[in-house]
Design a protein with these regions (language model features):
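Helix N-cap / loop-to-helix initiation motif
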Residues: 38, 63, 163, 211-215
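Structural motif
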Residues: 12, 35, 77, 92, ...
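Rossmann-fold dinucleotide-binding core
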Residues: 116-185, 190-194
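Rossmann-like NAD(P)-binding element
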Residues: 55-116, 123-124
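NAD(P)-dependent Rossmann-like dehydrogenase/reductase catalytic/cofactor-binding core
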Residues: 2-5, 28-33, 168, 175-186, ...
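NAD(P)+-binding Rossmann beta1-loop-alpha1 motif at the extreme N-terminus of oxidoreductases
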Residues: 2-55
Length: 295
C-alpha cells in the first residue's frame, strides 16, 4: 500500500478525543496535523499536550528531547486543505450524524484519491457516513476510548462496502500506535457500549426502584471486581451522554430491552448531569469529590 510510507496522519477535531488521538499518533512517530475550524479548540489542545508533556518531564518519565521531538511532529491547522498528503484521516468531531457527514464530504473532496478516512464514532452508522463520499470502500470506524493515548483498545468497524485492503491498513496503523483491536459489528453501540451501557441503565432502574447508589456500586466493585461502580461511572461520563447512548441503542434495535430508564430522562431534564454539574446520583464539591448521595 504505497501510501503507508507517507507517514502523515490528519486528525479532524481538536476536542478531548481528537487531541488524544493526535498525541498518540505523534508519540508513535507519525507526522500529524490536527485540524479544527475553531481557533480556541486548537489553542486549548496545544496547551493540554504541552502541560501533559511538561508534567511527564518533571516526573522523569519523559526527556526534554523526547518532548521536543514529539511536539515537532504535531502541527495544527484551521484549513481542511491540509489533509493532502495524509495516508489516513481520523475524524473526531462531535457525535452528530450531520456533522460527521459534512466533515466526511469535505475531507473526501480534498484528500488524495487513495487516502483512507476513519471515524471515531462510538456508534453511528459507518455505512451511512461513508455514503456521502466517493470512496465508501476506503471508509471505516475506528473507535478510540478516553483517554486515547492511554486506553489500549481500538474497536474496528467495517461498513457494508469497506474493502479488505482498507481494513488491513487501519489494523496495521492500530498496531503501530500501540492499540489492541477488536472487530465490532456495525450495529448501535458496537461492542463495548452495547454491553456496558445497558448495565449502567439497569443500575439506574435499581436506584429508581429504591436501591442506594452506594450499594449498587459496591455490589459491582466488590462482587465483580469492577474498578468503578455503574452509578459512579454514569456520573463520571455524564448522565446526558450515557442516556444518549442508551437511546441510540433503543432506537437502533427497536428492542424494548434497551428501554432507557425514565429516571435518567428526568435527571437530564432537571440539569443533573453528574460530576460535571456537581449533581448527579451523587453530590460533588467544587473539586469533584463525592460529598453525599441524592437518592
Amino acid at each position: 500500500y504505497k501510501n503507508m510510507e507517507k507517514n502523515k496522519v490528519a486528525v479532524i477535531g481538536a476536542g478531548l478525543m481528537g487531541n488524544g488521538i493526535a498525541q498518540a499518533c505523534a508519540t508513535a512517530g507519525y507526522d500529524v496535523v490536527n485540524i479544527d475550524t475553531f481557533e480556541a479548540a486548537i489553542e486549548k489542545s496545544k496547551a493540554t499536550v504541552e502541560k501533559l508533556f511538561s508534567r511527564k518531564v518533571a516526573k522523569g518519565s519523559m526527556t526534554e528531547e523526547k518532548k521536543a521531538e514529539i511536539l515537532g511532529r504535531l502541527t495544527y491547522s484551521q484549513n481542511f486543505e491540509d489533509v493532502k498528503g495524509a495516508f489516513l484521516v481520523v475524524e473526531a468531531v462531535p457525535e452528530k450524524i450531520e456533522i460527521k457527514k459534512d466533515t466526511f464530504k469535505k475531507v473526501d473532496e480534498l484528500a488524495d484519491a487513495e487516502t483512507i478516512i476513519v471515524s471515531n464514532t462510538s456508534g453511528l452508522s459507518i455505512s451511512e457516513i461513508a455514503s456521502v463520499t466517493n470512496r465508501p470502500d476506503k471508509v471505516m470506524g475506528a473507535h478510540f476510548f478516553y483517554p486515547a493515548p492511554v486506553m489500549k483498545l481500538l474497536e474496528l468497524v467495517r461498513g457494508l462496502v469497506t474493502s479488505d485492503e482498507t481494513y488491513d491498513v487501519v489494523k496495521e496503523f492500530a498496531g503501530k500506535i500501540g492499540k489492541t483491536t477488536v472487530d465490532a459489528p456495525e450495529f448501535p453501540g458496537f461492542m463495548v457500549n452495547r454491553i456496558l451501557v445497558p448495565m449502567q441503565n439497569e443500575a439506574a432502574f435499581m436506584v429508581m426502584e429504591g436501591s442506594k447508589p452506594e450499594d449498587v456500586d459496591n455490589a459491582m466493585k466488590l462482587g465483580c471486581n469492577h474498578p468503578m461502580g455503574p452509578i459512579e461511572l454514569t456520573d463520571f461520563v455524564g448522565i446526558d451522554t450515557m442516556l444518549a447512548t442508551m437511546t441510540g441503542l433503543y432506537n437502533g434495535f427497536h428492542d424494548s430491552k434497551y428501554r432507557p430508564c425514565p429516571l435518567l430522562e428526568t435527571m437530564v431534564k432537571s440539569g443533573m448531569l453528574g460530576k460535571k454539574t456537581g449533581q448527579g446520583f451523587y453530590k460533588y464539591d467544587e473539586k469533584g469529590n463525592k460529598i453525599g448521595s441524592n437518592f
